[in-house]
Amino acid sequence: MGPPGNDSDFLLTTNGSHVPDHDVTEERDEAWVVGMAILMSVIVLAIVFGNVLVITAIAKFERLQTVTNYFITSLACADLVMGLAVVPFGASHILMKMWNFGNFWCEFWTSIDVLCVTASIETLCVIAVDRYIAITSPFKYQSLLTKNKARMVILMVWIVSGLTSFLPIQMHWYRATHQKAIDCYHKETCCDFFTNQAYAIASSIVSFYVPLVVMVFVYSRVFQVAKRQLQKIDKSEGRFHSPNLGQVEQDGRSGHGLRRSSKFCLKEHKALKTLGIIMGTFTLCWLPFFIVNIVHVIQDNLIPKEVYILLNWLGYVNSAFNPLIYCRSPDFRIAFQELLCLRRSSSKAYGNGYSSNSNGKTDYMGEASGCQLGQEKESERLCEDPPGTESFVNCQGTVPSLSLDSQGRNCSTNDSPL
């Protein structure tokens, strides 16, 4: 089977419809079709609505236009295409128990399916590398990976995904040679994705397993560094809260800078966890299908068709999960609230991401930590002066970010992932 496989050669039979023996059976079949149609419609709407919201938020609010969020946009585009051009036709294939759109659209639809899943996993792999660079070279990150370079990387991801999907499918390199497959290829109402063993294994390895291994390896390194930095934060805060009052007074402002640096680090670790959840969810949703994909070409009678369809749709549902995961980020959460008119804003809104909250204070989009005007104690403010070089070194190895307070001053120094 091809990597992201469609409802494929395990789809419900296409060579005839089942004639029920009793009216009760017929009613059950009709109820099943109606129930599945409603469920699949909800899935499609969730995928389309959620990912349109993500793309719109990043396009509208400058606060979200970071290098990593460029990759998030690419991921959302892949999910959106999945929701518009793949899932609806897959639902029709199941509910109608036959393919109604001809041979050309069958192969084109299959190519889009492979394209979207390949682009998704490769984009997640790129995000992992992006975070690795941010951790190992936090002061060189902005020069190493600019927005223009990010656009080029995204373009390359989609080109490679297109070559992996459209080229072998449209050139018929994927086709099997046994009679059942040949009959399906020539039948207008059959769109079962029969593949030869070489294509099934090679495409699964290139499109899924290799990027997955790279992603897991790189991200494990990222978390190792992040864990060490959290331990440094704990030790630093332990020294700051020492019972020796003389030491605290002696440390003075340096202790305050250390605390601000620690808060910054903890915020970025939460963003790192959000990216980890996105990658983990994608893996959990698609890995079972790709395991079955390999097993099937080795032993085609081992996996029941119902299991295959279920795992395929588990992968489809992943496209609806990511917008929900992004809600962990204050940046995205506030942007979504603005777009859905769930957050009160002043009559004067700025394209750079500023908005006024219900208290009349000006927040920078996404900074839920309190970067706002007000009479706060010096020791409790996050957004005053950027952490000094000495204190920021304690945070080296975390995800760099850029955030501003209401007066436009830097709270930190680099780009923000989420």
UniProtKB/Swiss-Prot annotation:
Per the record, residues carrying Phosphoserine are 261-262, 345-346, 355-356
Topology class, membrane? Multi-pass membrane protein
Q: What compartments host this protein?
A: Cell membrane; Early endosome; Golgi apparatus
Q: Lipidation (S-palmitoyl cysteine) at which residues?
A: 265, 341
Record topological domains on the Extracellular side = 1-34, 96-106, 175-196, 299-305
Cytoplasmic side, ranges: 59-71, 130-150, 221-274, 330-418
Xref: InterPro entries: ADR_fam, ADRB2_rcpt, GPCR_Rhodpsn, GPCR_Rhodpsn_7TM
Give each disulfide bond as a residue pair.
106-191, 184-190
Regions that span the bilayer: 35-58, 72-95, 107-129, 151-174, 197-220, 275-298, 306-329
For the motif PDZ-binding, what are the positions?
415-418
The protein's GO terms of the molecular function aspect are: adenylate cyclase binding; amyloid-beta binding; beta2-adrenergic receptor activity; norepinephrine binding; potassium channel regulator activity; protein homodimerization activity; protein-containing complex binding
The text of the family note is: Belongs to the G-protein coupled receptor 1 family. Adrenergic receptor subfamily. ADRB2 sub-subfamily.
Protein name, as recorded: Beta-2 adrenergic receptor
Q: Which gene encodes it?
A: ADRB2
